Amino acid sequence: MKHIDKIISHLVNNPEAFDQFKNGNLTLLNINEKEKKAILYAFEQGEVPRTSKWPPIEAISNFFEDDKRKSLI
């Protein structure tokens, strides 16, 4: 999950990177399609604020504890 935490943190702080992420190559990020869907779901549901004031890494990992979200990864 550490790599997902880092990706989310990077996307939150770089709006241009988010657009590239939605349309880009996943192999460079070391994630699979399901992980990409889970991250996009987080943004679409408003769970990830588009600001640099994101909570600690633990909060990001906790996001994926929800059953519906777990099913995405």
Curated annotation (Swiss-Prot):
Name the Gene Ontology molecular function terms of this record: pheromone activity
Query: Which residue ranges make up the pro-region?
Result: 1-52, 59-73
List the coiled-coil residues. none
CC per GO annotation: extracellular region
**UniProt KW Lipoprotein keyword:** yes
Record PTM text: Trp-54 is modified by farnesylation, which is essential for activity. Modified by the tryptophan prenyltransferase ComQ before export to the extracellular environment.
At the top level, the lineage of the source is Bacteria
Question: Where does the sequence pass through the membrane?
Answer: none
Which residues are annotated with the lipid modification 3'-farnesyl-2',N2-cyclotryptophan? W54
Pfam families in alphabetical order: ComX
Which BP terms from GO are recorded?
establishment of competence for transformation
Per UniProt, which keywords does this protein have? Answer: Competence, Lipoprotein, Pheromone, Prenylation, Secreted
> What is this protein's record name?
ComX pheromone
Originating species: Bacillus subtilis subsp. natto (strain BEST195)
Q: What is the lineage of its organism?
A: Bacteria, Bacillati, Bacillota, Bacilli, Bacillales
